């Protein structure tokens, strides 16, 4: 495969993408710092700013190292504005994924993830380490699943939503677009669009939020 470009050097989750690339034996062409501020890269020599992005770099496939859906969408828009057209789905070799899994472009699946059969992951979705998704799960575009999340079968997570660390979502539950499930929550019923829920059982704490960190997609 071509060398890979990672967008988002200012995000601390970057190091996990670098480790996945190492486990896969993928070479990095560059790591783009798309915002002012320090870089979290393990390989600092690969870090460049937006002004240094070249046509040669844009010929390589790209992934995005940002957990917040709105930030990931912003970085994607930046990359497309520079002329990027190739977006790679990066799947850690320690993840257990079914042969029936459907993935779109730009997906990241971190280490030790388990996904059940007949599930689908939308474009630019992000599945963080040790999450366990049941069979027939659907994760929408730009949605982010936090570390250690557990879902039952037939769960649906809407576009741009975030499921916090260690949350549990019972079978058949639907999470709306740009919703946020707080860390450690147990979700027993459907969650509407743009809602923040938390607790065991999870209840609505806020409605009309833009999204995670008040940035929607």
Regions found by a protein language model. Give the residues of each.
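Short amphipathic alpha-helical segments
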Residues: 17-19, 74-78, 121, 193, ...
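Glycine-rich adenosine-cofactor-binding loop
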Residues: 2-21
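NAD(P)-binding Rossmann-fold cofactor-contacting core
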Residues: 23-40
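Short hydrophobic segments within beta-strands
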Residues: 6-8, 32, 65, 182
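Short, solvent-exposed amphipathic alpha-helical segments in soluble enzyme
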Residues: 20-25, 79-81
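Structural signal for interior beta-strand "rungs" in well-ordered beta-sheet cores
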Residues: 90-198, 202-205
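Short active-site oxyanion
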Residues: 2-5, 28-29, 59-63, 177
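Phosphate-bearing ligand-interacting subdomains
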Residues: 36-96
